């Protein structure tokens, strides 16, 4: 999965000292403009951190990609949020 991090357009957020990662994930998903939103490696329905990517080009195309990152066989898989909502509570 490509990243916009080198251009300063990605951020990883951890709600350790404020809102929970679930609250961050759902707030961004429901209220903000983004290109890619990833709930990273949830445990017991709680993401370990939240990855947000912004791209003006993709925003013009009205793209919003929401994923859940999981580890499987030592590899990271990005599952579409739709159909896997049960992994995030």
Question: For the regions a protein language model found, what residue spans apply to each?
Answer:
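Catalytic cores and adjacent binding grooves of peptidoglycan-active enzymes
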Residues: 2-9, 15-89
């Amino acid at each position: 999965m490509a990243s916009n991090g080198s251009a300063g357009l990605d951020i990883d957020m951890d709600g350790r000292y404020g809102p929970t990662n679930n609250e961050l994930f759902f707030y961004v998903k429901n209220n903000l403009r983004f290109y890619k939103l990833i709930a990273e490696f949830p445990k017991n329905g709680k993401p370990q951190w939240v990855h947000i990517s912004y791209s003006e080009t993709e925003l013009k195309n009205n793209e919003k990609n929401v994923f859940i990152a999981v580890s499987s066989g030592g590899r990271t898989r990005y599952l579409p949020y739709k159909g896997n909502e049960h992994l995030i509570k």
